[in-house]
Structure formats: C-alpha cells, structure tokens
C-alpha cells in the first residue's frame, strides 16, 4: 500500500521552518488558516448560495424547536470545504510528511472529508436530510481506519497496545487493528452527531484539539502539534461564520473529517483513553443516540410501543426540548468541553510524572 511504501520527503516549508525555526512553524499554523478564513469565508458563502447548496433540515414536526430550526433551511452547507481544505494545505506545507503519525492523520482526514462531501452533495441534490447510506459511510471509514491500524501495527514502532493512565500498557496483539478502527470510526461519527447546533461542533473541536496540542510535549509526539494547531486555527476561522446565527454549516464534509482526524491523533499519540475524557462531549452525543435507539427498541418489544429515554437525541436536542436556547446549549457544552480538556491534560501530566518516578 501507499502508506507502507511511501516515505515522502519533508517539504520545503518544513525544512526551512520546522527544522530551523520550529516556533515559526507553530505560529504560522496557528495564524494562517484563521487569516485565510476571514478572506475566503465570505466568498465561499456567496458561491454556495449561488449554487443553491442549502442545508436541508428535518421536518418541522420532528424538530425540537421547529420554528427556529426551519429558519435554517437553505443556509449554505459544505463550509467544511474551506475548513478541511485549509487543514490539508497547511499539513502539506508545514508538517513533517515523513512522520507515520502525520501520514495517518492526513489519510483519514482526506478520506473522511471526501466521504462527507459525497454525503452533503447527495443531500443537496435530493433536497433531503438523508444523504448516502449509513452502511456506505461505515465501509469507507472502516477502509481508512483499517489502513491506519495495519500501518501502525506492522510498519511503525511502539504500537500494538492500549495505554491506560496510571495502570500501564495492555498488549492487544492483532486485536489492536479492530481497536484502532473502532476509535477512528467512533470519533468521526461522534463529531458528526455533535454538529447539530450553530457553533457547537466547531467550538468543542477547538477545545479538544488545543488539549491534544498540549499533549505532544507530554507524550512525545511533537510532529502532531502543527497539525493540531492547523485544526484549531481553521475551526476558529470557520466559527466566525458558524456562530449563531450561522451563515454557513460545515456539513459532513467538515464534521466527519474533524472527528476522523481527532480519533487518528489519539491513536497515534497512544492516548485513546484520554480521547474519551477530552472528547467527552462528543462521546456523550454518540452515547445518547445509542441509548435512545436501544431503549426505543427494547420498550417496543416489551410494552408494544417504543418509548424514548431522552426527549430527543442527540443529547443537545434533549436540552433544547427542556427549554434551553440554542446559544445556552452551545456555551454550556463548550464549558463542559473545557472542563474535560483540563481534566484530560491533568491526567496525562500526572501519568507522565508517575511513570518517571
């Protein structure tokens, strides 16, 4: 495969900046996507409007706040083209492409972004909130995640185990590959489920990526810091147009790719357990959907009618139905994400300290 055989040389920008001036690389990664978004964003929104690439929404009867959500019908989607495009371009320019971790992150980001694009395109052309089939999504995500799992297990050193803070490593053997697939696929879809309110997914992603950006200094994967800063900067730029009331949505093009990238970063850092903590908001969103589906099917078999565990899933809609405004849900979820990120970084630091003793 390409990943097993290719060893792309470091880019010119990496040789100039990262090798001799690593701080300059981090500054550029942290600023350029944000600045570029300010100039590209309005033009992209205008193009998407001209192409009538509007976001289909659920039927009014199914919406937790029908009048408010119906106003969003027609808001341009596929804003992830700008967000993920800037991340990919920045990765090619500033990141060390000879690093297996960077290669894996770039692969998953590109594949899931393309998958998200196909899904968004299907929704727009069909004028429906249903895109490509869920089975097709899982298959494509599984192929990309399988490539990463095999590459790390067979072609890179130091992989094949699960690191549990304060407890050490558990060797997984060949089970490491399906474990990697579970992490990446789960993360990709969890972020996708979170992208249901203006600014919610992008804001939580900024916090999670910043937390993981602090971890390379702790766990020894500094080559991922520029990649994570690119995500933070691009999400900040996108949030300028995605905050309430949103002028553009990232669509599955952005959310599937961001989630896939975050999951791959956690795998490459060997911090899958911390992903559950730092990405706790994403986990809660995904778990709420699984609980809702399970409970509905269980009660339908037992009582003859399906009952809901939450007012509505994903869980951000549960709070909307409980009377929280959209901005209240977003800000409070951001606060929860920040608290979990601080907790995760604290656990990582203490784990390193205990290991060094």
Name each model-derived stretch.
Residues 59-75, 127-140:
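Juxtamembrane helix-capping/reentrant segments at transmembrane boundaries
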Residues 123-133, 164-170, 300-302:
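Membrane interface segments of multi-pass transport proteins and intramembrane proteases
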């Amino acid at each position: 495969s390409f990943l097993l055989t290719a060893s792309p040389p470091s880019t010119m920008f990496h040789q100039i900046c990262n090798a001799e001036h690593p701080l300059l690389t981090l500054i550029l990664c942290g600023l350029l996507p944000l600045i570029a978004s300010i100039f590209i964003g309005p033009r992209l929104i205008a193009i998407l409007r001209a192409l009538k690439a509007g976001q289909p929404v659920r039927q009014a009867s199914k919406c937790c706040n029908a009048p408010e959500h119906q106003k969003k019908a027609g808001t341009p989607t596929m804003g992830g083209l700008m967000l993920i495009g800037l991340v990919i371009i920045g990765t090619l320019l500033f990141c060390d492409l000879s690093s297996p971790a960077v290669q894996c992150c770039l692969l998953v980001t590109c594949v899931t972004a393309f998958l998200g694009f196909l899904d968004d395109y299907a929704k727009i052309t069909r004028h429906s909130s249903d895109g490509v089939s869920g089975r097709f999504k899982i298959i494509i995500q599984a192929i990309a995640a399988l490539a990463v799992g095999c590459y790390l297990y067979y072609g890179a050193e130091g992989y094949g185990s699960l690191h549990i803070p304060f407890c050490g490593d558990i060797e997984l053997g060949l089970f490491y590959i399906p474990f990697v697939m579970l992490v990446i696929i789960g993360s990709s879809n969890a972020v996708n489920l979170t992208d249901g309110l203006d600014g919610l997914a992008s804001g939580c992603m900024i916090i999670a990526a910043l937390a993981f950006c602090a971890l390379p200094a702790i766990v020894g994967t500094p080559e991922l810091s520029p990649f994570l800063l690119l995500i933070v900067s691009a999400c900040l730029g996108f949030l300028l147009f995605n905050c309430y009331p949103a002028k553009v949505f990232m669509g599955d093009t952005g959310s599937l790719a961001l989630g896939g990238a975050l999951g791959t970063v956690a795998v490459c850092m060997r911090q899958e357990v911390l992903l559950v903590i730092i990405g706790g908001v994403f986990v809660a969103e995904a778990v709420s959907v699984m609980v809702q589906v399970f409970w509905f099917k269980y009660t339908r078999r037992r009582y003859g009618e399906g009952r809901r565990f939450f007012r509505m899933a994903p869980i951000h809609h549960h709070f909307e139905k409980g009377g929280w405004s959209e901005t209240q849900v977003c800000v409070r979820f951001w606060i929860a994400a920040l608290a979990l990120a601080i907790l995760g970084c604290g656990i990582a630091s203490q784990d390193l300290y205990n290991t060094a003793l």
